[in-house]
Amino acid sequence: MWGCGARALLGVWEVRLAGFLGRRLLGSNAAAGKSIAPQCWNCGHAREAGCGDEFFCSHCRALQPPDPTRDYFSLMNCNRSFRVDVTKLQHRYQQLQRLVHPDFFSQKSQTEKHFSDKHSTLVNDAYKTLQAPLTRGLYLLKLQGIEIPEGTDYKADSQFLVEIMEINERLADAQSEAAMEEIEATVRAKQKEFTDNINSAFEQGDFEKAKELLTKMRYFSNIEEKIKLSKTPL
């Protein structure tokens, strides 16, 4: 009788021990899976996510290095969308430059000067990229793993290429300001049409269509650059 009771008691302890070890194992796995907060390079204080201060240590106020995982849309406080409020984008750009521009770090350590240069370059690149519809669209595609190498005629049909050639010929032959303005108006209207259609393609998640339209838009952007150069006095 005693032997049966001992075996029963031993079984209870085994169940309890297994449960205890299981909880310990789950706890250690959760701790291992939890990401470790980055530390300030200057004071070693943990930089907590979501603390509201993206660029400076909340403890010692030292400028921190740029976050390599952050995309341009996040940096500039924009939704990851082809449709961007350019006025808000400009305000964000000015705000960031007041925070990280190298002129404000001339008396700081070499490390902070270096980080300031990195931040300022990143902010400039983000602003220029998101400001223009073409570069914004190409960047959105890049975030999807899709790139259009320069000089690619992706789905540019012969009729479209003839249209581009004719506009370039008109531009080369333009002898008056009125002729130049007519070409410029044509190009501006085409770019507006492309912008609207590209926005629709991204909203529908049709990245192939967006890629096709952005390829064509790049041709007209090149013509726009030629028009600007023709207006620049020598």
UniProtKB/Swiss-Prot annotation:
Keyword Metal-binding: yes
Species assigned in the record: Mus musculus
The protein's annotated pathway: Cofactor biosynthesis; iron-sulfur cluster biosynthesis
Family stated for the protein in its record: Belongs to the HscB family.
Record-listed a divalent metal cation binding positions: 40, 43, 57, 60
Gene Ontology CC terms: mitochondrion
J domain segment(s): 71-143
Keywords assigned: Chaperone, Cytoplasm, Metal-binding, Mitochondrion
Null allele phenotype: Knockout of the gene is embryonic lethal. Specific loss of the gene in erythroblasts is also lethal due to anemia.
InterPro entries: HscB, HscB_4_cys, HscB_C_sf, HscB_oligo_C, J_dom_sf
Family matches, as HAMAP family: HscB (MF_00682)
Gene: Hscb
GO biological process: [2Fe-2S] cluster assembly; primitive erythrocyte differentiation; primitive hemopoiesis; protein complex oligomerization
Name under which the protein is recorded: Iron-sulfur cluster co-chaperone protein HscB
Gene Ontology MF terms in the entry: ATPase activator activity; metal ion binding; protein-folding chaperone binding
